[in-house]
Amino acid sequence: CGNLNERGHKSEDYRNMEAALNEAIRVAQRQESMDQTLQVLLEFVGKNLEAGRAYIFEKDDHDHDHNTYEWVAKGVLPEKDTLQDLPPEIFAEWYRKFDENQSIVTENLEEMKDVDPKMYEVLVRQNIHSLVVVPLYDDGKVIGFYGVDNPSTRYFEFVSEMLQIMGHFIVSSLKQRNLVRELEVMSYSDPLTTLGNRYAMERYIEQVDHTEPI
């Protein structure tokens, strides 16, 4: 009977999380900019999983990683400014797993100490004892990752699945943000750029996400 009750609570937690996820996407779609959209999504992820921190990392053209978005719980120190332009060797083990379509699920950080000492040193400094990180894919290519630190043990078993579901919307938002930035740097007063502007606008319209609730 105890196991049945526990499974019932888990099922209810999952349904509640799905409903909250749909609401987060609806709220995110109403934001004025993609930056705001991404912040809303991270806030949802962090608060609903009772995590200390939620974040997005993006890979640049030199394979360096940058923490581009971050949400932190009350009392947790922000880390974004200290996590910029990180060399490839820092996340090498993670990207190897991402290339194999695997996520990073660590319930006890001490398990990482001998397996991935470089990453362990980065994480232990931030007072992290557990984390779940999933890759972000664009056309099959890993463009970065996002995840949460110290999520509630109550939700741990389905954190990865929830992050993967939300990941599709995050990638779509990142792509829309990039296209908006392209448009902003183009000069609309130069007739030579008219064709390029029209092409960029068409790409933006194609990328606008009409995500339906899950």
Language-model-derived ranges and their functions:
Residues C1-Q36, L183:
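Signal-transmission linkers at sensory-effector interfaces
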Residues E202-I214:
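Active-site-proximal structural segments of metal-dependent nucleotidyl cyclase/transferase enzymes
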Residues L136-Y146:
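Short hydrophobic/glycine-rich mini-motifs in sensory/regulatory modules
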